[in-house]
Amino acid sequence: TEFVTRLPDNAVARACIASLRANGLGTEGIVFGGKRMGLYFLESGAAFRNSNVVYDREGSSFATLRPGMIDWEKIFSDAGWFHWSGIAAALSQDGADACREALEIADRMGLTISCDLNFRKKLWNYGCSAAEVMQPLVQYSDVIFGAEPEYKEILGIQPVGFKAVDAKDTTFEANLPAFEDFGRRVVELVPRCQKAFLELRNSITSNHNLLAAILYSDNTLKHTGIYDIECEVDRVGAGDAFVGGMIYGLITYPDNDQKALEYALAASALKNTVYGDFNHVMVEEVESLMQGNTSGRVSR
């Protein structure tokens, strides 16, 4: 797995690259340029107080990325899957154009393409709406990930709503026909899309969340059960954990979409219990949670 980005050539960036390598990611696709890394600052919420993010990304190395700066043909020469995030298109028009460049080359070279819609309202500041920019780019996607509000902002699909209050809540299953219509609408708007994933979250408080997930593929809806996370540690990165788990699941269980979906949600649920952006859990831990091991006992 290769991580592709643009970073300044300085000690801070080198330390970040070392961290990526320590977590098993290839970094040969990283190019150097610009003068600073983008930052974000997180004010963690508690109880009824929401978390808040402040972005400091204007003028960063990635925000000033332009087409032609990355040798996509070289990067894709031995690749089979290209995953991209809507955040990459949110920072600037040049960044959106670089996304299109990558997608066109990945498409021409026959890669599977997946997209995390990743709508971040605070980042779209260059005069274009997310829908205006993202809708043409999403058309290249074989696999799409997102939450209901993101599908609404980018594709205009009205949310069904996930209001479960505990793991035994029956309203989720009662709404499955509506979620099936939701998935069908995604495929209508993005004909190339073979699999549309929807991660669902109901926040009771900042530290108490319920999670579930849905997959629409081949005119069929698949769904998980509900995870009730009452003592959340850090939800930042849980969506990325879901996407990473889903890609891993689709590759590892190519003939079992249900198992891949369960793996993705278990990975995301575990990330809610881990502090920081990275999901520092093992495959065995995810599989254990999939099998119903939720005791939290010490493993000796």
List where the protein language model places each region.
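Conserved post-catalytic alpha-helical subdomain immediately downstream of the catalytic base
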Residues: S206, K222-N293, R300
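Anion (oxyanion) recognition and catalysis
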Residues: R21, R100, E104-R108, V138
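Conserved N-terminal subdomain of the carbohydrate kinase-like
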Residues: E2-I87, C115, V286-R300
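Short beta-strands and strand-loop turn motifs
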Residues: W81-I87, T112-K121, E148, F197-E199
